[in-house]
Amino acid sequence: VTSDTQHPVRVVQLGGLMPFVREWLAERYAAPSLADLSDPSGVRVAVVGGGARAGAAEMDALPDLGAIVNFGVGYDNVDVEEARRRGIVVSNTPDVLTDAVADLAAFLVVDVLRGITAADRFVRSGAWARGERMPLTRDVRGAVVGVLGLGRIGTAAAERLEAFGAVVHYHSRSPKDVAWTYHDSPVALARASDVLVVLTPGGAGTDKLVDADVLDALGPEGHLVNVARGSVVDEDALVAALEDGRIAGAGLDVFADEPHVPEALLARDDVVLLPHVGSATVETREAMARLVLDNVAAFLERGELVTPVG
């Protein structure tokens, strides 16, 4: 794909986008992939999703780049500091996926406490038919659920869990104007929790925030749920804690090196594994795509973004 004076290429796709998003971009902007772009001059917007990288190399390849539009609320795949240094603005897709991710977070809490997927495996294995007994599980009502990161999604998840009768505690950068119990560190929150739910954004500041100390504080009866970013949890420490019985189990929708999941986790019945589907509903993904298009249009027309990052 080349650009000319009549039909300049102003938008490029960096990868990781769903087919319908690629089609929408192609229809509206004739947006090719970076690999198919023979002349990068004049490209003002790069759209990226699915964890595809938008770093210095990609920015070097697009000398006129002015904006990186990310399909997703998390943007640790984008080198925001490098973009800022070059005067490139970055957007994400907040708010529109809040409900879907909060729903999944709440469902995973219910699952790890009530053993829903474990019970499904129990039936399918023939254990029930053989007269074996499924172990007793835990009530959601009265359980202390610690929400690590009380942003939009964390708040929505906490509200759902409170409706189940759970007791909500939380940690964030500072106390919020809420009735829930605040803790001043992840370790303190984990120590008070039956289930620790990770909902903090990714990025350098949260890399391996949930480490061995946090997991030890959670304790042998505690469960970890992560629907944020795989980078937030020290995966090696998590595997070790599970193998040593230092925590009771986990529910994970995200991993450090997706789509690769550690073999040690695949082999465990006390872990619920999902393929990063927190926002994977038709309605949510379409809303995210519309917000991506709104950001692209706003930047090309006015030099501004609808949902800029930081």
Annotate each predicted stretch with a short phrase.
Residues 150-151:
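Glycine-rich Rossmann-fold phosphate-binding loop(s) that bind the pyrophosphate
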Residues 54-56, 173-264:
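Rossmann-like adenosine-cofactor binding region
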Residues 8, 65, 141-144, 221:
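Phosphate-coordination loops involved in phosphoryl transfer and adenosine-cofactor binding
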Residues 2-8, 84, 91-104, 131-136, ...:
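C-terminal helix-to-coil terminal segments
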Residues 1-93, 191, 211:
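An N-terminal-biased, well-structured beta-alpha scaffold segment characteristic
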Residues 29, 88, 180, 270-271:
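Short, conserved active-site loop motifs that form the nucleotide-linked donor/cofactor pocket
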Residues 94-144, 156-159:
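Phosphate-binding beta-alpha-beta segment of Rossmann-like dinucleotide-binding domains, i.e.
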Residues 169:
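Conserved beta-strand positions in the Rossmann-like core of class I SAM-dependent methyltransferases
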